[in-house]
Amino acid sequence: MSRTASYAGMTTPVKDKEGHGIPCLQPIDVVECTYQYFTKSQNKLSLRVGDLIYVLTKGSNGWWDGVLIRHSANNNNNSLILDRGWFPPSFTRSILNELHGVPEIGNELEIFQAGLNLKLELSSNPVILSLEDFLDCCRDIEFKEQLAWSPIPVHERKGCCELLYYNQDLDVYCRTLPYLPQNQVETVNDYSSFPAISKIAGKKMPITSSPDLFYLNDCDVVYWYDLTRLVCHYVNLTERDLLANEREKFLTSLDLLTAQITYVYMLFRNLRLVEDSFKKTLKKLIYTLSRFSINANIWFHSTPFEEREAIASQKDPERRSPLLQSILGTFQKFHFLLRLLHFLSNPNELTILPQLTPRFFKDSFNTISWNNPFLRKHLNQHMSHDLPRQMIKAVAGASGIVAENNDEIPASKQGTSCSSETSHHSPSAPFQRRRRGTIFSNVPGSSDESDTIWSKRKKPYPLNEETLSLVRARKEQLDAKLKQMIKSANEYLSNTANFSKMLNSEMNFKTYEEVSGTIPIIDILENLDLTIYLNLRELGDENRVFDEDVAIDDEDKEFLKHSLSSLSYILSDYFNMKQYFHDVVVKFIIVAQHLTLEDPFVFSPMQNDLPTGYYEPMKPSSLNLDNAKDKKNGSQNTDIQEEEDEYEPDPDSLILFHNLINQDSDFNDLKFFNLAHVFKKSCDDYFDVLKLSIEFVNRLILERENLLNYAARMMKNNITELLLRGEEGYGSYDGGETAEKSDTNAVYADSDTKDNDEWRDSQVKLPRYLQREYDSELIWGSNNRIKGGSKHALISYLTDNEKKDLFFNITFLITFRSIFTTTEFLSYLISQYNLDPPEDLCFEEYNEWVTKKLIPVKCRVVEIMTTFFKQYWFPGYDEPDLATLNLDYFAQVAIKENITGSVELLKEVNQKFKHGNMQEATAPMKTLDQQICQEHYWGTLYSTTESILAVDPVLFATQLTILEHEIYCEITIFDCLQKIWKNKYTKSYGASPGLNEFISFANKLTNFISYSIVKEADKSKRAKLLSHFIFIAEYCRKFNNFSSMTAIISALYSSPIYRLEKTWQAVIPQTRDLLQSLDKLMDPKKNFIDYRSELKSLHSAPCVPFFGVYLSDLTFTDSGNPDYLVLEHGLKGVHDEKKYINFNKRSRLVDILQEIIYFKKTHYDFTKDRTVIECISNSLENIPHIEKQYQLSLIIEPKPRKKVVPNSNSNNKSQEKSRDDQTDEGKTSTKKDRFSKFQLHKTKKKAPKVSK
């Protein structure tokens, strides 16, 4: 790459298309060659003495990128030869700074040259091109990337107003900001782009100390600049301590300096800077440091302290001791070699260093000793390997394997195995052999869960009372043994003469027996089912993209976000408790082993006095001159100070301790301690952590119930379904209650179901041509209901001429859309209408078949189709393909054949498909009262406290019941099916207007009640409002209006209202007890068992049920049961999972819909007050959401200290349950203090503890 250019030619600066100057191709330095350098490489420059090189980039690996300016061989032609390439800076010197009067670098080079006795013959008057000439020469050179921007200083001009940019590091003002290359970071971090380190297969690459790759300490040295500062810091510190005559500080500083030089040596090895110049300089550097260390130790040991003090205080260097001058001379040579090494390597100060210290890879270690399902779920969603992809690439590069794309990165040995035939990204065989032998043969899998026996449990323990009972039962078994051990320790403390090695061995054996009995508790803690919290975290992710069938509005997102923030600290404490459990058990075992030792300090020499990471390179900003020595023992002293007052002083130990100190001038600060004291303390901690585990399991169970309870009360069944998705046992439906329904509540009576067995027996006696063809493909349940069957069998049973199963027919017509499309269903019916006769029938048998089977089946088909169009047709069932069936022609054919009901069928078909008036025909008529209520929309609002309190609670509850029952009556079975099916079976359902209006009204009522309280500034009025709404809720219960009652309870237990401590104190206890009884009725424990019992006892009384229970039942039944039955033995030898429809699932859905429809039949006989109803309806609009209400709550009662609230509530029962557990299990105030010491980020190495 060269060209000839005119030496004197002047050009204008490079401009872009808009005419603006671009500061590209600007050299950052100009150097002159001082030594000859020849190379055959095309991308490197060959240098001769006197050549001028314009430096464009200073590489971090010791190679610079520059443009060489050389005179042409033809002297008659005033021209230059330009070449661009890499060159070693050690063969050049900088001349640009000398011309600008900055001699620092030149002076240092002169020192180097004088020390090496070099004689240079350089040009005395080098000619440097101007920027314009340089740009003119380089205009035609093609560069692969834009070069780094160099700041152009702005000279001070008076009276000039312009925008300037200041760079603090360079101390320069500029008019423009830098043009950063797009791959600037990669250029700094990528060592493979320079000649010294080539990215060749088999060439090992260093693993960079990237924050994205490792869990780094805040003070870790990451950049070359940090390492340079660190070494200089310890060099200065060592020299200062030597001259200050401080022996201990000097030894400490010298020790740390030696460690840093070791890291520098490791750095050069990792960067493959192994040329002779580097090796010789490193060897001289280490040799000089060792001489300095030996001479300094001789100086401190051979010279008395006073003499050293006098010599060190001399300011005149010539009057110092020859030995000290020799030591300082050796240290100055060490200085020189260190700077020389730096100039030889000439690194980029922003270069990221290789990883020099052991650190954990990110996403491969979760810093705890237990299973972390949150980390495992995160990894499974974001990567196909069970090891982080960046970790695999880094380890592969360090092993000499280069993967051009992610598909070539091998998975770890714990990944799922697949055959070579099915693998789409299978590496070559040599690569596979090399991978197994080099990288991952010793790399473990992700440590997101511990490799223990109990971590292999297949089914997790559910968060329920049964699991809590297991933990409590196991703890009670351990308590008896533990109390006996504590008793033995107390007896020993009371009489030390009873010391016996046999007794200690026995206690050691009991300890192991006790710990082995803890395994069931560890099993439960390790395998708790936290699926609901995992789903909550995923749903609360702001960047999550939901599927089309998941309907989550802004209100739901706010609820999920609020729930996640309120529960996160509980989960964090739970995992901290598990780590604390681990620490206590380990300490318990160690202390028990300690009992068997005759000398408790026998292992003390094995203990490292230095804290972890003492010799690791740390940023100098974390050190100062005062704590350089204290860093050595700071961690240990801190731990001793934390526990120095935990044991009672032992007089005998103190006397012996002081006597030994008086006899010895040197001691290690270790104190004597009583083994029984330590063992008793470990027993107490072990006893407390067992209580703590029960408490946290209980908290997780209660918080799960509270979360589901709130979602159920707000009728957010979609949120409930998403939260419980994937949980063990999710969706289990207990059909016992449905089967036990009273006959009074039964809507679809079926008197024939009792005779099903006799009827099936009678079918066997019929001739073969009259028997049903698909009867063998029907599956019957124990309650004489169809449990499942094939599509043909279900259609055949639906149109059976002898058996009319009314419940089956209604269930089929309501839920058919989950089995067939509309076109498919009607096609099956038409095919059933046109039955083909069996083969080999004689004339008499054929006539009997037509008379006894064909004609009755045709009548049944017409009857079913008429009933379907008349009572169960929904506009969303319409499909384009229905026109191909010619239903009107089918009805006309049935009329010609004189089939009963065919005329009515034709009428329904014409009404549904020709007149296009389907919605008006099926929509219920609105009552006159509803129309009047909608016409008079604008009315008085309950906008003030006085207006609300002025309404009698009985009147308010009465009119609220009338209004909500009318809305409830608008709910249809199609609204319910659409709510749970969404777009699962069809996308033409549309919204659920009736059900959505009912849910919206209940939620608006909740917001209205809570807002009415928080907007009132006066405490006494707020208390009156609380009592007023509690009385309204009680009357709603008397009127069987459980929907409004639940809405009021939810408002009073919402976070903005519940935290009003002073307001709740003003409510009389009797009123709070009343609220407690209402809340207990709606307790979600055992699937709202109290509420369901209350609802079942109503018989024929009018009622507005709480619809959240129905939504939960519908959701769990639909999502928790499969659409198809899986049989162990297929019928007729056929094993087809999708062949047998799970009709029992559809029957359960209809059972729930049956109860919903039942409560629509009986109406209230209350007198309607249109004014009150109108005011209630209008007051529910435009209410601020819960977040705004919470802000108002903080304003009226800021910073609550202690929650004094109603006696019980569902949203905050965890606190009351926690208080109950503390009463039952004893006070555990001290365990929380101990637990706080074992936070993950505060865990420290414990030193031996003694008594004073």
UniProtKB/Swiss-Prot annotation:
Domain (N-terminal Ras-GEF): residue spans on this chain: 782-914
Highest taxon of the lineage: Eukaryota
UniProt-listed SUPFAM superfamilies: Ras GEF, SH3-domain
A Pfam family: RasGEF
One cellular component (GO) term of this entry: plasma membrane
Record domain SH3: where: 26-97
CDD domains assigned: RasGEF, REM, SH3_Sdc25
Keyword Cell division: yes
Gene Ontology BP, a term: Ras protein signal transduction
Alphabetic keyword roster: Cell cycle, Cell division, Guanine-nucleotide releasing factor, SH3 domain
Bias type Basic residues, positions: 1239-1252
Domain Ras-GEF: 952-1199
Biased composition (Low complexity): 416-428
Region called Disordered, residue ranges: 409-454, 623-648, 1201-1252
Keyword Cell division: yes
UniProt-listed InterPro entries: Ras-like_GEF, Ras-like_Gua-exchang_fac_N, Ras_G-nucl-exch_fac_CS, Ras_GEF_dom_sf, RASGEF_cat_dom, RASGEF_cat_dom_sf, SH3-like_dom_sf, SH3_domain
Extra remark: Suppresses the CDC25-5 mutation in yeast (restores cAMP level) and has similar functions as CDC25.
Described function: Promotes the exchange of Ras-bound GDP by GTP.
Protein name: Guanine nucleotide exchange factor SDC25
Gene source species: Saccharomyces cerevisiae (strain Lalvin EC1118 / Prise de mousse) (Baker's yeast)
Taxonomic classification: Eukaryota, Fungi, Dikarya, Ascomycota, Saccharomycotina
